[in-house]
Regions:
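Helix-helix packing/entry segments at the starts of transmembrane helices
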Residues: 99-103, 170-180, 219-254
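Hydrophobic alpha-helical transmembrane segments of multi-pass membrane transport proteins
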Residues: 9, 13-17, 21, 72-89, ...
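Hydrophobic/aromatic residues within transmembrane alpha-helices
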Residues: 25, 33, 88-89, 114-116, ...
Length: 319
């Protein structure tokens, strides 16, 4: 059990501090960062699949049309989530991105009601109404809809829904999704370089090295989460998942000095209160994980595993 906590803290802690990594390469346009992340993730996962002996599983998944339809849909939501997160971090919207990951579990529950016919418990109803009030407050008083938070939460949610009925292991799933995006990523980066707009080889060895390592920072938290998911109860993971957005929030507020006035504080307080009620309901009711599949943890960035109230595929997505 102790090792499970260490793996969970490693996964959620890394996801929480990954904004620092993307901030260090903010000179690179967000779409180019995402394309590099796709390419180097594919190349890193190839030997990992060989090492873990999962190529037969990968080939079986590719040969299953129903599985591939879901994987292609998931890859689209994965790309949207990665792009929104990297753009937010690079443009001083880290606090808003943390809001997206805070409200994501509640959005999963709401989608379960709307699309899957699930029933809300009283605690869940109160939590969703409070969170919606918080988001509405921020939209009204700040003057703009927090579209980054909504984009991150909804892409996370739809990613989990796309993978709801699949049982593809996490490394295989991430490799397939990244491979689906590989050709568009290569075409886009090639076009950017031909137009003289490519970032690789332009900003120095540090930036180039960090782009190359983007596959590692994508895969390591996923590996940690996959181990944690095998060793800890889902309710424990459901609580620990909030470490990631909390670290993101603290980075944005304390380290990067993003604006957080009294108006924003009220909106976040409503959301945090909603999450406290949601967590209490989760612990006392022992609710099963939403959108979970037998073997597939949530995805990062870029954006978190088979969590109660979160898509199991979140670990590939976050940051």
């Amino acid at each position: 059990m102790r090792s499970g906590y260490l793996y969970a803290l490693g996964a959620f802690g890394l996801w929480g501090v990954l904004p620092i990594y993307w901030q260090l390469i903010r000179e690179v346009p967000a779409l180019q960062v995402v394309c590099h992340r796709i390419i180097w993730s594919v190349l890193l996962l190839v030997p990992l699949l060989s090492w873990t002996g999962q190529w037969p599983v990968a080939m079986a998944a590719i040969g299953n049309p129903a599985t591939m339809i879901r994987q292609v849909a998931a890859s689209i939501f994965l790309a949207i989530n990665w792009l929104a997160f990297v753009w937010a971090v690079s443009n001083g919207r880290m606090i808003e991105s943390s809001l997206g990951y805070y409200i994501n579990p509640l959005l999963n529950v709401l989608l379960g009601v709307l699309l899957l016919g699930e029933r809300l418990r009283h605690g869940q109803t109160i939590a969703i109404l409070l969170a919606a009030t918080g988001v509405g407050w921020l939209s009204w008083h700040v003057g703009t809809v927090p579209w980054i938070a909504i984009a991150l939460a909804s892409s996370f949610c739809l990613y989990g829904l796309a993978k709801k009925t699949t049982s593809v292991p996490p490394l295989v799933s991430l490799w397939i999704e990244a491979t689906v995006l590989l050709f568009p990523a290569i075409v886009y980066l090639t076009g950017q370089h031909l137009q003289g707009k490519g970032a690789f080889g332009v900003h120095g060895l540090r930036i180039d090295g960090m782009l190359l390592a983007s596959g590692i920072v994508t895969s390591v938290p996923l590996w940690c989460f996959a181990n944690a998911a095998q060793k800890l109860p889902l309710s424990t993971l459901g609580i620990l998942q909030y470490l990631g957005p909390t670290l993101q929030f603290l980075l944005g507020w304390w380290v990067y000095k993003e604006p957080f006035d009294a108006t924003r504080m009220i909106g976040f307080f409503l959301v945090w209160t909603a999450l406290s009620i949601f967590a209490w309901d989760l612990v006392h009711q022992g609710s099963p994980a939403r959108f979970s599949t037998t073997n597939d943890p949530p995805a990062s960035d870029g954006n978190q595993g088979p969590l109660v109230g979160t898509p199991k595929a979140a670990s590939e997505l976050e940051q």
